[in-house]
Amino acid sequence: MKLPIYLDYSATTPVDPRVAEKMMQFLTMDGTFGNPASRSHRFGWQAEEAVDIARNQIAELVGADPREIVFTSGATESDNLAIKGAANFYQKKGKHIITSKTEHKAVLDTCRQLEREGFEVTYLAPQRNGIIDLKELEAAMRDDTILVSIMHVNNEIGVVQDIATIGEMCRARGIIYHVDATQSVGKLPIDLSQLKVDLMSFSGHKIYGPKGIGALYVRRKPRIRIEAQMHGGGHERGMRSGTLPVHQIVGMGEAYRIAKEEMESEMARLRGLRDRLWNGVKDMEEVYLNGDLEQGAPNILNVSFNYVEGESLIMALKDLAVSSGSACTSASLEPSYVLRALGMTDELAHSSIRFSLGRFTTEEEIDYTINLVRNSIGRLRDLSPLWEMFKQGVDLNSIEWSHH
């Protein structure tokens, strides 16, 4: 077993060696390096064929038509293209959008930008376990609501929203439904031929493909229109201009092909490891699970260790690559906005750690992690005056702390 142990698969994954090997064939003079938009020679045709194969591989994993897959630079761009693209195209119909407070920043900040442009956005607060109350969603829907954006799996706490029911609710009212599926694709079954989802964002690097490539699913029947955000040569049926990066697209396609083959057995394995990790720490005092194991992704475990400062905990766990929040926001010392939206105190939010497991995680690593966490928490609490006061029965909420 090698240290440090990587348990931050929700931030990014290593490229699968099978994917890397495939990508190498599309870079050099000896390989298929052509521009797929070059229609006048073999180099272009071969590149175009490789892109078509990858488009099919992605469509097959999610039950879509390959013509519904639009390549982008990643899920952040897909979220932007979906939300801004739909809002701009349908704004004559209405200017109201619904999302949730626990979405990824790529959705929240896109909605904030649209608010500056005159759109109105309702941000739903989830229930304590992170699940959106569908009655609240229904109550928020209005005649001028044009778009709902609610993710499939939350990147911090792993809870799974009921996108099938939300899709039915939106379709019944003629509202477009966008789903950020970055954390669920290849981990949970997705069948867009059955789901009433109109737009869905995907990433390559969360599923053992390369960084810098993603896709947006845009439904054809009923046809969804979006306004391009990137203008140029009219690539991707006019929705996203820019020369297609064939090596990255091929990598994403291969990663999705592997995921389709291995998803069922791999997710059962990861669920077992996640449960083993939780069972190994849950009997400690003042340890709380964030999210919901029953309605959760099999590979994410978010736990708060009360009376331990999150930053010092991460320092103590230097042999583990884990995070306190998502990589995009963990650089700031602010507690996770996702956990705060669940109604958690700043103290508890600060002491939370996200463990995300993946393809190369072993049972040995999980057992090492359990021991390390138990020892580190014990040591840090021994040093903590707050823990001492808590053990003496002092109600810490009743203390007036002096500001200095």
From Swiss-Prot:
Its cofactor is pyridoxal 5'-phosphate. Pfam families: Aminotran_5. PROSITE patterns: AA_TRANSFER_CLASS_5. It comes from the Bacteria. One of its GO terms (molecular function) is cysteine desulfurase activity. Transmembrane segments: none annotated. Its EC number is 2.8.1.7. GO terms for biological process: [2Fe-2S] cluster assembly. It is found in: Cytoplasm. InterPro entries: Aminotrans_V_dom, Aminotrans_V_PyrdxlP_BS, Cys_deSase_IscS, Cysteine_dSase, PyrdxlP-dep_Trfase, PyrdxlP-dep_Trfase_major, PyrdxlP-dep_Trfase_small. Pathway: Cofactor biosynthesis; iron-sulfur cluster biosynthesis. GO terms for cellular component: L-cysteine desulfurase complex. Pyridoxal 5'-phosphate binds at residues 75-76, 155, 183, 203-205, 243. The modification N6-(pyridoxal phosphate)lysine is found at residue 206. It catalyses: (sulfur carrier)-H + L-cysteine = (sulfur carrier)-SH + L-alanine. The active site is at residue 328. Keywords: 2Fe-2S, Cytoplasm, Iron, Iron-sulfur, Metal-binding, Pyridoxal phosphate, Transferase. The keyword Cytoplasm applies. [2Fe-2S] cluster binds at residue 328. Belongs to the class-V pyridoxal-phosphate-dependent aminotransferase family. NifS/IscS subfamily. PANTHER family: CYSTEINE DESULFURASE, CYSTEINE DESULFURYLASE FAMILY MEMBER. Master enzyme that delivers sulfur to a number of partners involved in Fe-S cluster assembly, tRNA modification or cofactor biosynthesis. Catalyzes the removal of elemental sulfur atoms from cysteine to produce alanine. Functions as a sulfur delivery protein for Fe-S cluster synthesis onto IscU, an Fe-S scaffold assembly protein, as well as other S acceptor proteins. HAMAP family: Cys_desulf_IscS. Homodimer. Forms a heterotetramer with IscU, interacts with other sulfur acceptors. This is Cysteine desulfurase IscS. It comes from Klebsiella pneumoniae (strain 342). The lineage of its organism: Bacteria, Pseudomonadati, Pseudomonadota, Gammaproteobacteria, Enterobacterales.
